[in-house]
């Protein structure tokens, strides 16, 4: 069974993903974003991209999915630039996997 891919964030940052066939969910409020991420997880989305600005507001929601195989939650910069939250998560996960920070 194929899993779906979604992106959650502000309109200007996520609209371009529509051209790639990714399901786009516009959200700027933390309450909306939390509900959207939880709904997408239940609806069999395998990958959910979330802009760092939204992720910063819904950290506890994202943390609930950290130990689960699906959905994979990947933080991406918005059109306003990066907060380095996504890269820090990658560094932490790589360090857990190999025992040292190789990035």
Curated annotation (Swiss-Prot):
GO terms for molecular function: ATP binding; proton-transporting ATP synthase activity, rotational mechanism; proton-transporting ATPase activity, rotational mechanism. One of its GO terms (biological process) is proton motive force-driven plasma membrane ATP synthesis. Coiled coil: none annotated. Keywords: ATP synthesis, Hydrogen ion transport, Ion transport, Transport. SUPFAM superfamilies: AtpF-like (SSF159468). InterPro entries: ATPase_V1-cplx_f_g_su, ATPase_V1-cplx_fsu_bac/arc, ATPase_V1_fsu_sf. It comes from the Bacteria. Produces ATP from ADP in the presence of a proton gradient across the membrane. HAMAP family: ATP_synth_F_arch (MF_00312). Belongs to the V-ATPase F subunit family. This is V-type ATP synthase subunit F. It comes from Finegoldia magna (strain ATCC 29328 / DSM 20472 / WAL 2508) (Peptostreptococcus magnus).
């Amino acid at each position: 069974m194929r899993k779906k891919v979604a992106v959650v964030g502000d309109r200007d940052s996520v609209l371009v993903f529509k051209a790639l066939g990714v399901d786009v969910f516009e959200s700027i409020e933390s309450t909306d974003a939390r509900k959207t991420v939880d709904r997408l997880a239940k609806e069999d989305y395998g990958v959910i991209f979330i802009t760092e600005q939204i992720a910063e507001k819904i950290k506890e929601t994202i943390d609930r999915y950290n130990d689960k195989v699906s959905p994979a939650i990947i933080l991406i910069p918005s059109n306003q630039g990066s907060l380095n939250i996504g890269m820090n998560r990658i560094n932490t996960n790589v360090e857990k996997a190999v025992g040292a920070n190789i990035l």
